[in-house]
C-alpha cells in the first residue's frame, strides 16, 4: 500500500496562489490541502486589499463543530465580529508580525475579513466535510459580492483599521 503524499506549504506555492488571487475578480484565492469530503479542512486563503468577504457565520449539524481557526502567516488582516443586526462588536488586527497571529472563532460567530496588506495569507482549519450550499450563512442586509455597495463597504472597513 502506498502512503499518501507529504504536502508542503512553500513560499513558491504561496507566491503562485497570491498571483492567482491578484488575477481573480474576487481578489482572493484558496488552495486546499484537503479533499472536500475529509473531516478536517486545511487550506490557505490569500487575500488582496479590496476583497469583499460578505459577513457570515458557520452553522453545522450537531455532530460537527462549526469553529474556524485562522493563522496569518504572511501580511495583515482585519477581522470584524458582528451581531445578528450587523453591528460591530469587535475589530481585531491579526498579523504575521504579531502581536496577534491567530484567532479561533466559535461556531455561529458572525464575521468578515479585511486584507490590510497585499498577499495576506491565512492558514485555516475547520471541521468538514465541505458542503458548498451549507458552508456559510450570510448575514441579511449586506450586499452581494461584486456590487458597488460591497466595494464601498470594504473601503469603510479598511478605513476603520487604518485610522
Predicted regions and their residues:
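Conserved short histidine dyad/triad with adjacent acidic residue
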Residues: 26-27, 45-64, 96
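Glycine- and acidic-residue-biased ligand/ion/polar-headgroup-sensing regions
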Residues: 66-84
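Double-stranded beta-helix
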Residues: 87, 112-163
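Short beta-strand segments in beta-sandwich/barrel cores
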Residues: 43, 51-54, 75-81
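His/acidic/aromatic-lined binding-pocket segments of jelly-roll/cupin-type domains
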Residues: 43-45, 62-72, 103, 113-114
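Short beta-strand His + acidic residue motifs that chelate non-heme Fe in jelly-roll/DSBH
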Residues: 55, 79-81, 103-105, 111-116, ...
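A short, N-terminal "cap"/entry segment at the start of jelly-roll beta-barrel domains
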Residues: 1-44, 92-95, 156-163
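Short acidic-glycine-tyrosine-enriched beta hairpin
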Residues: 83-111
